[in-house]
């Protein structure tokens, strides 16, 4: 049984923690007060079965899937809550408001220095493997950042894409003058509109919520399915 540390409570980080938590001791570090808040990703699943294998029937029902032409819409913030609970039930240690201040690697282990966390104390975590998934998370409060290491393999810089999303009444889709790159009709009478940048168009009733992110994925690749596939590939890498 290995000691695994995952930095970043993204969908990728949560799925990876659930997979690793069945076989290893896992610590999930997130700089936010609550994982998935604010939610800055589309609530978009292309194929339900990709997510259903991680959730039970009651959890699936709670997400209130609604079919769209490009898959299914769901409440992204609810998914974060459900996956966080599942990770905790598997024994994953979750450190919130926790910032990595230093990472030192040797041939046999990685030493991670942190500040904050559940006990609001500085700490040292020694692990066999660390995954840095901070690129997939929302911007940190107060512009706080982790201090990570630069590795030519796992931590190499990727191309970043900026996305802007807005939530409005579903009826507003008839009034759009700027075609969104991604549109998701939700079960709650609301609709997610996603663009590469904030549109000049404004809903007549205004934006109920606005979201922004900068991550290494184009908008067309931001389905929850792709996040799951990436997490699964990282988990498989532990065995190679």
Regions found by a protein language model. Name each.
Residues 66-86:
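Short beta-strand to alpha-helix junction loop
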Residues 18-21, 84, 88:
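Class I S-adenosyl-L-methionine
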Residues 3-5, 24-27, 128-131, 205-210:
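Hydrophobic beta-strand segments of well-ordered beta-sheets in folded domains
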Residues 13, 35, 137-139:
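Glycine-rich nucleotide phosphate-binding loop and flanking beta-alpha elements
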Residues 15-67, 77-78:
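N-terminal FAD cofactor-binding segment of flavoenzymes
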Residues 9, 31, 133-134:
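Fold-independent oxyanion-binding glycine-rich loops
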Residues 90-207, 214-237:
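Predominantly flavin-linked oxidoreductase catalytic cores and closely associated redox partners
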Residues 2-27, 223-238:
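N-terminal Rossmann-like FAD-binding beta1-loop-alpha1 element of flavoenzymes
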């Amino acid at each position: 049984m290995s000691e695994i540390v995952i930095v970043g409570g993204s969908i990728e980080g949560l799925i990876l923690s659930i997979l690793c938590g069945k076989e290893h001791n896992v610590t999930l570090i997130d700089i936010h007060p609550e994982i998935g808040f604010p939610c800055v990703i589309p609530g978009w699943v292309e194929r339900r079965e990709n997510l259903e294998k991680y959730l039970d029937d009651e959890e699936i029902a709670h997400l209130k899937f609604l079919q769209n032409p490009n898959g299914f819409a769901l409440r992204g913030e609810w998914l974060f809550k459900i996956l966080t609970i599942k990770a905790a039930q598997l024994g994953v240690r979750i450190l919130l408001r926790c910032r990595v201040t230093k990472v030192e690697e040797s041939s046999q282990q990685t030493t991670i220095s942190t500040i904050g966390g559940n006990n609001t104390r500085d700490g040292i975590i020694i692990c066999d493997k660390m995954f840095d998934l901070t690129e997939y998370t929302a911007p940190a409060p107060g512009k706080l950042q982790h201090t990570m290491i630069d590795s030519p393999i796992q931590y190499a810089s990727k191309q970043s894409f900026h996305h802007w999303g807005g939530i409005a009444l579903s009826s507003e889709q008839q009034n759009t003058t700027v075609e969104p790159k991604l549109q998701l009709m939700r079960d709650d009478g609301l609709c997610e509109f996603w663009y590469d940048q904030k549109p000049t168009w404004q809903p007549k009733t205004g934006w109920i919520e606005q979201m922004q992110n900068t991550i290494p994925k184009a908008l067309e690749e931001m389905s929850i399915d792709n996040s799951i596939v990436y997490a699964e590939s990282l988990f498989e890498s532990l065995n190679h």
